[in-house]
Amino acid sequence: MGKTLYQNKTLYQKLYDAHIVYEAPNETPLLYIDRHLVHEVTSPQAFDGLRAMGRPVRQPGKTFATMDHNVSTQTKDINASGEMARIQMQELIKNCAEFGVSLYDLNHPFQGIVHVIGPEQGMTLPGMTIVCGDSHTATHGAFGSLAFGIGTSEVEHVLATQTLKQGRAKTMKIEVNGEVGPGITAKDIVLAIIGKTGSAGGTGHVVEFCGSAIEALSMEGRMTLCNMAIEMGAKAGLVAPDDTTFNYLKGRQFAPTGEQWEQGVAYWRTLKSDADAKFDTVVTLDAADIAPQVTWGTNPGQVIAVNQIIPAPESFSDPVERASAEKALAYMDLRPGIKLTEVAIDKVFIGSCTNSRIEDLRAAAAVAQGRKVASGVQAIVVPGSGPVKAQAEAEGLDKIFIEAGFEWRLPGCSMCLAMNNDRLEPGERCASTSNRNFEGRQGRGGRTHLVSPAMAAAAAVSGHFADVRDLSAATH
């Protein structure tokens, strides 16, 4: 692994090149896949394809499955979310048993959102290629792994061969330097980035996040960042592994031990972009300029600081952006020129693969403590996994939420997407810690505003959007 192999390479190029199995002239290279994560929604047809051709799962020990999208967060009853959900979950149980794949089902203590359980169990390691039939697989890039979402036909290909054809992407460096102010989180950083690049600014690229503000983030913050790389159109997001990464991983169930751990860390330290590496695109931000962010429109790029006014469509010079803003304002039932702090909410959702880890729940609980959810607001807190739920309860966070009037739920994807019982009714407005604010994402006619966990809790206790910096407990 000498320097000569890696001269002038970005982290992405190192990861990509290390996994090429075969590359013929004028053909898309074939990459080896180290880890394959599976859930109940995008896998049934893939397993059916294997069965029809009489193929086994090539390396079942590198494949892990869980139930998350369809599950009820109020009961562990497989029938609770409707017939389609029941069928998909039962199919996953059958397929995993038949093909020898490890499954974290509803009764398993590790069950949870696939992009939460992978890292917390140490399945996600630096230097790996990781795929899942889910667009937010980019989350795992926080560990310096090349992780991206795939379609169901590709799920079948990986199950059958442990490989995937994958073309080279362009490279983008997003550098955030300086220190963020009090109350500013990774969610605010990534929303500010998407606000600058636009929701298609990263199209065709793999993004590497770097700079002193990124290095200062915990692994949980870095996961939030990489989770939303897809929301700027990127194929994947990356953060170079460092001591923060290694300290997080050490001792986790699937992490290496002993001499293998030492060898792993020695290799992982080489996984960074060379000083002379060239990126196709470079974006820079000053961390000190970032305020708490709230989306106002129907894509994550339509975002402003909480203390700014909702923009008028005429303020956009690009005609496509102007038309998009007009449509978004109409759908969201918002008027240009008003402050977001004047906008009342109906529901609050704290959860999702973006923000349902223990640090997210601690940040929200710090705001909720000693306060009450505003009259007429329904607020739910959905931990990302069984271990997150257990840790939160050991710390007494569940009691803080319940006392404040929040609902404390079981793990699952929940209100991030309208595939289970947690959804918005037409016209309802939600402060959500999830990653997508598209029309109907949380339920037909629902209006989604993306915020950090602390900002979501602030909205819950205020009844409208509020600057978390104005609430004294935000100095947790």
From Swiss-Prot:
Record carries keyword Amino-acid biosynthesis: yes
One Pfam match: Aconitase
Enzyme class, UniProt record, top EC level: lyase
Catalytic activity as recorded in UniProt: (2R,3S)-3-isopropylmalate = (2S)-2-isopropylmalate
A Gene Ontology biological process term: L-leucine biosynthetic process
Cofactor field: [4Fe-4S] cluster
GO molecular function: 3-isopropylmalate dehydratase activity; 4 iron, 4 sulfur cluster binding; metal ion binding
Entry note: cofactor: Binds 1 [4Fe-4S] cluster per subunit.
EC nos: 4.2.1.33
Pathway where it operates: Amino-acid biosynthesis; L-leucine biosynthesis; L-leucine from 3-methyl-2-oxobutanoate: step 2/4
Purpose of the protein: Catalyzes the isomerization between 2-isopropylmalate and 3-isopropylmalate, via the formation of 2-isopropylmaleate.
UniProt similarity note: Belongs to the aconitase/IPM isomerase family. LeuC type 1 subfamily.
HAMAP family, A to Z: LeuC_type1
Protein name as annotated: 3-isopropylmalate dehydratase large subunit
Species lineage: Bacteria, Pseudomonadati, Pseudomonadota, Gammaproteobacteria, Enterobacterales
